[in-house]
Amino acid sequence: MVTAYILIQTEVGRAAEVARAISQIQGVTLAENLIGAYDVIVRAEANSDDELGRFVVASVQAVPGITRTLTCPVIHL
């Protein structure tokens, strides 16, 4: 299982709407609003790195109102 945090910037005034929409996507375990450089943080799980990449492009970035994403895969040291 691969886990990642996805930091999201949204269009002005759309952060809550984006977080609600993303929270409904299968594979998302957390979607919360932030204050600062990013508007939403998402925790997502996938079966592989490739699946995670497809998930971000096909599911997360397809949500209206998103202007930029930064995906941070979790590593276990």
Language-model segments: which ranges?
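A compositional/biophysical signature of low hydrophobicity enriched in polar/charged and small residues
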Residues: M1-L77
